[in-house]
């Protein structure tokens, strides 16, 4: 499990390197979607099944609509890929080399003090399987949000709708 969490973290950082190089809006949106899915897998790996599912549905359901509209409005005939320009390719390669170098340095050097010990990720876990508890905390929190914070949910939904409308209008040029 520790290696899976470490691998997911490396993939997440490499996704952010791919997004920060910004070759084209199409590829940037694709890398954000992949990074969001990997981030949800990290949450699932730490035991937050409900929270990982909700984040996956909200992020990938809502943001893919926004990415679809903005990409359709800003589409290029020949989009620039990560290997098409020298500066974009160099920035991606520098980021990947730095990530791999950091991983190898932390793995090989015994004198490196790591702030997070990967052998004790139990304190990061949302739900550990030990004990006789039958009620998990994350669905109860979502139920309380929809029960006591119903107006907050309505305002948040309206704000997201207005945000999508504003992005579409700005991308269209009106």
Curated annotation (Swiss-Prot):
The UniProt record lists the keyword Membrane: yes
EC numbers: 7.1.1.2
Assembly, per entry: Core subunit of respiratory chain NADH dehydrogenase (Complex I) which is composed of 45 different subunits.
This protein's name: NADH-ubiquinone oxidoreductase chain 6
Transmembrane residue ranges: 1-21, 24-44, 47-67, 86-106, 111-131, 151-171
PANTHER family per record: NADH UBIQUINONE OXIDOREDUCTASE SUBUNIT ND6, NADH-UBIQUINONE OXIDOREDUCTASE CHAIN 6
A biological-process GO annotation: mitochondrial respiratory chain complex I assembly
Keyword Transmembrane helix on entry: yes
Gene: MT-ND6
UniProt record similarity statement: Belongs to the complex I subunit 6 family.
Mode of membrane association: Multi-pass membrane protein
GO molecular function, one term: NADH dehydrogenase (ubiquinone) activity
Source organism of this protein record: Pongo pygmaeus (Bornean orangutan)
Main location: mitochondrion
Keywords from the named record: Electron transport, Membrane, Mitochondrion, Mitochondrion inner membrane, NAD, Respiratory chain, Translocase, Transmembrane, Transmembrane helix, Transport, Ubiquinone
Subcellular location: Mitochondrion inner membrane
Catalysis performed (reactions): a ubiquinone + NADH + 5 H(+)(in) = a ubiquinol + NAD(+) + 4 H(+)(out)
Function: Core subunit of the mitochondrial membrane respiratory chain NADH dehydrogenase (Complex I) which catalyzes electron transfer from NADH through the respiratory chain, using ubiquinone as an electron acceptor. Essential for the catalytic activity and assembly of complex I.
Annotated Gene Ontology cellular component terms: mitochondrial inner membrane
